[in-house]
Amino acid sequence: MFRVCIVILCIVLILYIHPPVTEPMSMRSTDFNQHLNDHGYYIDTDAMSIYDKHDTLIKHYPTLSFNSNESSRIAINKPLTNTILLDHNIPTPTHDIITTQNKNTFKHAKSYFPCVLKPVDGQQGKDVYTHIDSQRQFDLILNQMFKTHDAIMLENLVEGNNYRIFIFNDTILDVIERETPYVIGNGTSTLQELIRHKNNELVSNKRYPVKTMDLSCLQRQGYTLSSIVSPNEKVFITNTINYHNGANPKRIPVHTVDRDNKDMFLKAHRLLGLECSGIDYMSPDITLPYYKNKGHIIEINSKPDTEIHMKAENRPNVFFQTLIQTF
């Protein structure tokens, strides 16, 4: 029974002091304001506008977060966003919504396996469970999620690399690959010791530790927390590939992204009426067109965090310098 639980439960095991979370992209963002000022621009938050040093209006936005309330409402509604994308032939996972009212009569889970469960109103990858491939695992995770959420989104699992595409002023500014957290064995340390050491390093470098670790992820690779990992052996330690869960940000040059992919990202951005967005995209290779390697848009965020772009390669100025060039 203990072994079964190890396979099917995704358990939060490691607790560390969390680095401070930066503000989402908005006119009140300290970093954004500082870089604008450095380049001769300033923001009038009352007018929700950006001006140059000669007081010439550069651009007016509907809200301080750049996006209209309506477009933000659509983007926050994950099922609605998915439906809009599918209606316009943009690849995104098929989905169902499970609520406290229909959970006992919902009988279609098997048709989605392997699947993903995530809260309809979630953010930053919190409470997202992937690689669910059995009814028992599905039921246990679903019941756990209903303790804190009223509606759960069920999706087909999409495999591949995890990318964040940042769009502002109708321009793709930055593309980041979020690399899955892993450890490298040394032949003497247990997997749990290696994970603890990795998290200590992440925190000392002012990065987010791996807080959510999936034991089922370890089991699929043939490991437990007490396993001694062979020298130079790589072990992935979580299915939650998110910057706030220890993922490493790797900048992908925008010019290397396939043109059809870029057109698709901009189309999705415009369909929701957004001025600023962060698109989450899964694909084996973003330099190849989505229709050749089953690339899918997983989510569109109307208030994207800029921290991942600033931390990539420890070059925070690159992102904002590119952003300012859009004015």
Indicate residue ranges for each PLM-predicted region.
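Hydrophobic faces of well-ordered beta-strands that scaffold small-molecule active sites
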Residues: 117, 152, 277-279, 298
